[in-house]
Amino acid sequence: MVKLDKIYTRGGDKGKTSLGNGERVDKNSIRVEAFGTVDETNAVLGIAIVNLKSPLKEMIFRIQNDLFDLGADLCVPDNKKLDYEPLRINQFQVDRLEEE
């Protein structure tokens, strides 16, 4: 699990943001765009759930959970040594999403 103790840096904007491992990247980087899009998708699904009934609701809950995992994967680059094992989207999750 990604551990974020705080959501601010007090370092000013300067067009940069921090990834889950502390690495600073441009806010317009493809990685930041990707996890922003994943987060927006998850938010839209959350709004859609309000008026849905099972089993569609249960399917969307599973998709949302997978999107949280994907966002965590995008937030922590694979090329850095971490003190913990990051989440990774696996083939089971991909196959299940494609079936649904």
What spans do the regions from the language model cover?
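Phosphate/pyrophosphate-binding loop motifs in nucleotide- or prenyl diphosphate-using proteins
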Residues: 1-100
